[in-house]
Amino acid sequence: RKEAHGSLDDQALRQIADRLEYLRSLEKKKEEVARLIEESGSMTSEVSQALEKAETLSEIDDIYRPFRPKRKTRASVAKAKGLQPLADCILEQNPQINPEQEALAYLSEELEVTSAEEALQGANDIIAELISDDASIRKRLRVVTMEHALLTSKASNPEEDSVYAQYYEFSQPVKQIAGHRVLAIDRGEREGFLKAAVDLDKEKGLHILYST
């Protein structure tokens, strides 16, 4: 009714309705994640504040990620082999410590760590999972990806003709690409005509990690 919504047109009303639905979903997800973390006995004031400040569903997923029950991973296998202290040592980035030399202390036939290289690989697996589970890093990487990454696509088979031919050699900044192009590339990939990737300059990604 016009008296209820004034001069707003149908598109504006749909946007308001969509936003309201999203905010309701956001609050519901916050409550669900808070409950799950509480039940696991892992809730802290920092986690609670992070949930309260979260403005997107992806942020909530990032916050919950470290608490989500994990299947067997390379990092969990490395931890079972006693390599967490080695990972912690590497993270300290002490220039006086030689990681290769330090890794020799973790060799164990019983735990099936047979070489320094294997010990270092396990420690790196632990570090990789730690970084991947860090909500603040994931959020910052997402922002940098939106600002600086390229969406690229190429043909799975360059000789094969298809309606996706214009995307056989395609590259465009993520922040500039139109929605219909993203959908077309997604369809082309699902149908097997395209291979798509999001490319981010390695130096920008590393800068985020080192400035955390």
Please state what every model-predicted region is.
Residues 16-19:
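Short, charge/polar-rich alpha-helical segments
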Residues 12, 22, 26-212:
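Duplex nucleic acid-engaging cores and interfaces of nucleic-acid transaction enzymes
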Residues 1-8:
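Feature marking long nucleic-acid-engaging regions of large polymerase/nuclease enzymes
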